Amino acid sequence: MNKIKSLFAWLWQKFRAFCTWYKGLYQGRAWYTKTLVALASCIVAFILYLGAVDINFLWLFGKSPGYFSGILDPQTSEASEIYSADGKLIGKYFNENRTPVEYDEVTPDFFKALVDTEDERFYKHIGIDPIGVFAAAKDALLHHNGRGASTITQQLAKNMFRVRSQYSTGLLGKIPVLRLLIIKSKEWIIAVKLETVFSKKEIITMYANTVDFGSNSYGIKTAAKTYFNTTPKELTTGQAAVLVGMLKATTYYNPRTNPENSLARRNTVLYNMVTHGDLSKDRYNELKDEPIKLDFKVEENYDGQAKYFREAVANYLKDWCKDEGYDLYTSGLKIYTTIDTRMQKYAEDAARKQMKQVQQNFNNHWSIRRTQAGKGNWMGQDPWQDENHNVIPNFIQGIAERQPFYKALIARFPNNPDSVNYYYKEWVHPVKVFDYDKGSITLNMTSEDSIKYMTTFMHCAFVAMEPQTGAVKAWVGDIDFDHWKYDKVTAERQPGSTFKLFVYTEAMNQGLTPCDKRRDEYISMEVYDKKKHEMTTWRPSNANGSFSGDSIPLKSAFAKSINSVAVRLGQEMGIKRIIETAKKMGINSPLDDTPSLALGSSDVNLLEMACAYSTISNNGKHHDPVLVTKIIDHDGKVVYEGPTDSEQVIPYKSAFLMQQLLQGGMKEPGGTSQSLWGYVGNYRDTEFGGKTGTTNNHSDAWFMCVSPKLVVGAWVGGEYRCLHFRTGALGQGSRTALPVCGYFLQSVFGDPAFQQYHGKFDKPQDSDITRDMYTCASYAPKPKVDTTKVDSTAFQEEIVLDDEGNPVIREIPAKKAEGEATGSATTEEKKEKKKAKPTEQPINFDDL
């Protein structure tokens, strides 16, 4: 304590001595000496003040950037760019849409106009322009509307270091007048620091990259794209003058919202160039009469191609950015992805083409009509029905109550349900809704009808992947991103029979082959019902409602998607073992240890399924899906490279035999994937295999297709599981999901640019594999009387071309196709057919 008192006493003594000395400079001196002393004192005091501001003396002035922590490594918010595998910029992630450019990438006219208008002594001062300061002060005193005193370097300091917001103004900054003085002082200090570190060319380039041009356009590159759809290098003299003119007031001189103001300001900038010798008088006279021609488009985060994929990439990189200290929206990364823009367009076109037809079928199926205006412009049956085909009460009301507009009505009329119902059910107003032809249309309708309108759209997802690399080449998350942002590629739905891949793969793992047989017969077993919390009897049936009773080769059972055989195999191989195999092949979703898993009762997502099917195409080697190949930071350094490793997760023999089974879906009689030939039949140099899947009540329709170098998958269904077709003729995977894959494959394999995807599966590379394991007679059912009610087997199918040359399936009545054989049944046989019923018995594996 005594030492502190001694220190203050010493300081006070020195201060008094300084005051005595300073007084001596004035006493008895001439007036001019006193004047010089006063001026010198002001200069010294000002320098000391600036030093105190810079070091934040006694926390009075707030933090300022230092040389090493800020000036030498300035941090600006830069947009991260995302590129496709074929080198196209497909989008950006940004808070401020800014992409930096180099000095040589900007037209010289822009820099000339900028200096001539904003800072004519830019190349002469050191960050602060004393002449400009005094001129601005004089104009302010005389109430003239002169130019500002800030130099380009000072404006750069303000833009880059945000001294008005990012750095506090300390304790003294709470006083309004002092706050302004502190802010300007910091701008001067930072400007001088910038001038000592960077060249004039670097400073003016940094300014061009950081300045705000309005309309969410930060930096010259984004501004040139936004207002004129061009690059900074290709800006004309007039366009450059327009952009420079906006810097005085981006709203008042905006060429889109205030074209007259912008035109006058542009001509002022051009005249400044004339007065400084950077533009001839004749050229000025030509340009000043030209109108401003805009090609205006504000770039948003969601603009560009492959919107669902880009959102998936953002999620894919979330943890990586957090761990590595990057911000996806401000760090200026260049992200190189696996997507191919040409394949992506083929995928989007295929999805839209097929889903438009699916929607027409759905509307006709439920008698849905969508009129153009007024109350009740949505008409039809209510398709939101439970498994017993009963309309779900208050289904639309429940959706409405979760919407912001309905919550706002409740808040506005808390005790007035009549008013809420009026605005919800009666009030007709313009609503923007989806339309296949126009993308988006505005209809006059009630809020209730708008929910019905949008809810009854069918949805889809599609993904294409290279099995050898895991590279995702196309990704369609739904029919339209602007109206449905929820990505169905990663949404979990029941896969139906496409899950049989894992049942049969585990069977191959345990030594079975495609030519081994299992019986197709009635099954009954006791299982635990999670909903009812009790044991119940489960009786899985085949798609056609009947059982042949025959022993069927596994290749035929898989191709025809016979449920009874899949359930028997599931019990024989063990559900736990099947789950383990599915996990190894790429399924990460939780799977229930229940007999129905063999028929795809647990939810998975499309990306997982494509990854798992890729494991088969890749001869048993698993590769995680790859969305990003590399990332380069704003300094040009590679900071991330995508995974390239793969792991052998199932034996090669099992993978080869599964390739044969999948091809059987197209080659075997009655194979559920045969209609794919209508799309890829011309590409005989490539082998294809496929598996369809349809869940209960046709809520989910799937198709997975494999080839040696490309795997694709599609899902089709309603936003809610209660929205679906009522018949397999319209709702099964081969009718809804398969054509999405078919149209895509037709386009890709018909494009010479993708010749690398053509090819056939490898010949057996394992001496343990013999032809008799997978080459055997196909199953041919014996003619006999049906013992159950028949639905889908009442028709046979053939593939024909419609009027536009597109492959479609045409049903042929079975009697017509079979001729006399079917029509020869006697009356007694018909009666016997009605009487016969399957005998219920517990499952028995002794005869497997």
Model-found features: residue ranges?
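Active-site SXXK
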Residues: 113-115, 273, 347, 469-470, ...
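Short active-site loop at a secondary-structure junction
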Residues: 99-104, 451-460, 483-502, 515-518, ...
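Short, well-structured active-site flanking segments
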Residues: 123-133, 218-220, 280-285, 508-532, ...
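A penicillin-recognizing enzyme superfamily signal
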Residues: 337, 341-357, 391-466, 475-476, ...
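Conserved catalytic neighborhood of penicillin-recognizing serine enzymes
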Residues: 142-168, 233, 297-308, 512-578, ...
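N-terminal type II signal-anchor transmembrane helix
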Residues: 1-83, 121, 141, 358
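Non-catalytic structural connector segments
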Residues: 145, 280-338, 342-418
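Peptidoglycan glycan-strand catalytic modules in the bacterial/periplasmic cell-wall system
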Residues: 9, 76-285, 302, 308, ...
